Amino acid sequence: MLTIALPKGSLLRDSIDRFQQIGLDFSAFLEPKNRQLQILDPTHRAKALLVRAWDVPVYVEYGQAQLGIVGYDILREKKPAVAQLADLNFGGCRLSVAVPQASPYRRSVDLPPHGRVASKFVHCALEHFRRLDLPVEIIPLYGSVELGPITGMSEAIVDLVSTGRTLQENGLMEIEVLFDSSARLIAHPLSYRVNGDRLLDWVEKLRSVI
């Protein structure tokens, strides 16, 4: 039976919609009273696991799920040993550097050497500033990253931006985009080879509805 890791949060509804388009129904996850973390498709052809978005590649990498849907941002940060099969063209956003609107900085390279940057994307942020040959201290924050500059703990943040409204409401502005992100279909590399025809059939169906 096919096992799929689905992400909690903003990508879930569109992920379920894509699978519904190819005949697999996991919409029970969207019911307000649902507490199940694992459900069978009514046709009993597939099973879905509901996990934190950051954990999707872990379940796929360790073989507990053959397929998964996860944001490209997470793949860039975690660098898991998974096969990226398709850009699903939803969940669009970007990873950006942002600073207070009143600050003098207009590019990443303008930040002071050894300045502080708050982010949950620690590796992506480090890679970005290393490319610029600018030494900075990355402060790991995993919620309300915007508070870093607001409280004076950091000069900047590296965070996901969708509409930019949250930044604006907190007096911040984007100064540089690191990369664009969207939902990606991933697979366990060995499962993809061993179960080639069967798994490829599901993958091709998903690609057909992008």
Swiss-Prot record:
Q: What is its main location?
A: cytoplasm
Pathway given for this chain reads:
Amino-acid biosynthesis; L-histidine biosynthesis; L-histidine from 5-phospho-alpha-D-ribose 1-diphosphate: step 1/9
Q: Does the keyword Amino-acid biosynthesis apply?
A: yes
Task: Give the GO terms filed under biological process for this record.
Answer: L-histidine biosynthetic process
Q: Which UniProt keywords apply?
A: Amino-acid biosynthesis, ATP-binding, Cytoplasm, Glycosyltransferase, Histidine biosynthesis, Nucleotide-binding, Transferase
Q: Give EC number(s), comma-separated.
A: 2.4.2.17
* SUPFAM superfamilies named in the record: Periplasmic binding protein-like II
What is the recorded function of this protein according to its Swiss-Prot or TrEMBL entry?
Answer: Catalyzes the condensation of ATP and 5-phosphoribose 1-diphosphate to form N'-(5'-phosphoribosyl)-ATP (PR-ATP). Has a crucial role in the pathway because the rate of histidine biosynthesis seems to be controlled primarily by regulation of HisG enzymatic activity.
Per the record, what about its domains?
Answer: Lacks the C-terminal regulatory region which is replaced by HisZ.
* Record family assignment: Belongs to the ATP phosphoribosyltransferase family. Short subfamily.
Protein's name according to its UniProt entry: ATP phosphoribosyltransferase
